[in-house]
Structure formats: C-alpha cells, structure tokens
Amino acid sequence: MCIRDRTCLQDPKLPGIPFHFLRVDVAGNISKRFSLSGIEIPRYGGACPRWNVYSAFSRPGVIQAAVSKMTNGEKYVCIAKTVEKGVGRYGQKKSMLSIGLGCEAKYAKEFVYTENLDLSDKKSELPIGVSCRTCDRLDCSQRAFPPLHKKFDVDINSRGVSVYVNE
C-alpha cells in the first residue's frame, strides 16, 4: 500500500495517526516529503543529519526507531529503513534510499515500532533540528552550516569536526 494513501486516510469521524514521511538518498537529498504530524521537513537542502533517516544507511535493511526532540521541545517517534531502488537496465547498479516515517510522541502507544523504546528516558531522546541553517543547537557536533538567525563566531585558531564545530 502506498504511504501517501495511508497518511491521507483522515476521516474526521475516525481519525488515524497523523504521520510524517520522507525519502532521502545517500547524499542527503530529500526526494519525497509529507507531513501531517507537525514536524517541519525542509523544502530545500537536506534535513538535520541527526535524523535517523540518515543513520539508517549505516545499517541497511534494519528498521531503526528513535525518539526525536526538536529545538522547540516537540517530540516525535520516528522509524527509518533503507530500501533499494532498481533502474531496470541490465548491469545498472541499484540506488539506496532511506524511508522515514513518524508521528508525535503522544501517539507512540499506537505505533507498533515503539514497543522497545523507553519513552520516559530523557537520555534516549535524540536532539534534532530541521536543518543546520535553522537550528538553535549551537553545540551540535554535526553542524555543517552556520545558523542564519544567530551570531555564530568561527575560531580560525581552533579545529573541530567541521568549521562550525569547535570541541
């Protein structure tokens, strides 16, 4: 069944879980996006590299579940899994994509993939943002770009993981 069909089945009399959905490639490009959950998915560029939709590439074929906490405090339960996409020509390599699906944490009990997650453990929450340019987390070790709306000093005498990370 198509994900779009499952997420659109919102009968006002029998509302379902409002999911979000995204598909990304190994370069971080978002090729499909849909959100009823309220999570903001970037329209241009990639999403936060800490989203589990990206870490799914490190364990192909395995469903990974996580509790993600946005900078505004909203919590989401997210699952991600890689899939191979064939091009149909002989000798052509298949491309690897990652599919992310999630909902607000308040629906976690209705989402089968959360049964092994400890939703009360604050330490297991994965702090994420929308994207590096819009994220308030200045201490993020995976920051790839400076934030647009905050003053961000780059220390040329210090070397971190990237230009924007000085640890």
Please identify what each model-predicted range represents.
Residues 9-13, 57-58:
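Short linear motifs in intrinsically disordered
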Residues 21, 76-77, 165-166:
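Generic ordered-secondary-structure signal
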Residues 11-39:
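Extended amphipathic alpha-helical segments with heptad-repeat/coiled-coil character used for oligomerization
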Residues 39-142:
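Low-complexity, glycine/alanine/valine/leucine- and proline-rich hydrophobic stretches
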Residues 19-21, 34, 57, 111, ...:
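Phenylalanine-focused residue identity feature
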Residues 143-167:
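Short microdomains enriched in Cys/His and/or Lys/Arg
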Residues 1-5:
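Conserved small/polar residues in nucleotide/adenosyl-binding loops
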Residues 9, 140, 145:
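Residue-level marker of positions within ordered structural domains that often coincide
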